[in-house]
Regions:
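Short, charged/polar micro-motifs that form catalytic or ligand-binding hotspots
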Residues: 41-45, 69, 73, 88-102, ...
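An acidic- and aromatic-residue-enriched active-site/binding cleft used to recognize and process polar
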Residues: 51, 71, 86-90, 110, ...
Length: 243
């Protein structure tokens, strides 16, 4: 192939098509645990609502309730992946391997979204949330109340049940239940067998399993790190803002 602008543009079109096809067809898990919010600026400020009002009977004048808003700033990051195409391969029309490489790049780019999104779960033990505490902490505040969304027990039917009960017990400033409904259990591959037993077995240790079918299972290696090799997470992903 003669190297000129027209031929190079043709290569760009071919490589872009291969990349985009793989990008579109590769499936991800991030939609199960995170809400996608479009961004059109370098820095985005999100107003997190500490306590959203609930419906009540309308008697007399409206009672206007102020939203407890806290600012949470996120600066967008840029990511890149670059490969070189050898000039000799262009001149010799030896480009088939590069087309496959572009497809692999598209697949890797899509999978990187899972690495970032699902990787935020183990990152939540140190990364600060909107209240300047780690996302998973034992002393989050709602008004003059505090609640914990962090545990240390290894995954078992007992600890799973305790986590469900703890989540369901969380109330707002006025003492009304937040109606949290755990529906997704996220585990690393090392805990898949135990998780499947909890969610699918008819019996556990000879007694009826009350947790059969109580949640969907997501197995993902991105929640493992050296500090927390046996991480497991129970999430309510039924809300507009996940988790």
């Amino acid at each position: 192939m003669i190297i000129n602008n027209a031929n190079l543009q043709g290569l760009r079109v071919t490589f872009s098509a291969a990349f985009n096809k793989a990008l579109e067809t590769t499936t991800t898990q991030k939609e199960k645990i995170a809400t996608t919010i479009p961004s059109s600026s370098k820095l985005n400020t999100y107003g997190w609502l500490g306590d959203f009002p609930q419906m009540k009977e309308w008697i007399g004048e409206r009672e206007i309730q102020n939203l407890s808003e806290k600012a949470y700033n996120i600066t967008n990051k840029h990511f890149e992946m670059t490969v070189a195409v050898d000039r000799d391969d262009i001149e010799d029309d030896n480009l088939g391997m590069y087309t496959l490489q572009m497809q692999q790049m598209g697949q890797s780019a899509k999978e990187h979204q899972d690495i970032l999104a699902i990787g935020m779960l183990p990152g939540g033990f140190k990364g600060l949330a909107y209240d300047d505490k780690p996302f998973f902490a034992t002393d989050h505040a709602i008004g003059d109340r505090t609640y914990s969304n962090k545990g240390t027990a290894k995954l078992s039917a007992e600890s799973y049940g305790a986590a469900r009960a703890s989540m369901a017990s969380i109330r707002n400033e006025r003492g009304t239940a937040l109606n949290i409904k755990p529906c997704l259990l996220v585990v690393p591959p090392s805990l898949e067998a135990e998780a499947r037993k909890i969610l699918t077995a008819e019996l556990i240790e000879g007694t009826t399993n009350p947790w059969k079918g109580s949640a969907e299972l997501l197995v993902d290696a991105n929640i493992v790190n050296d500090e927390h090799p046996d991480n497991w997470f129970l999430l309510d992903t039924s809300r507009v803002i996940k988790p």
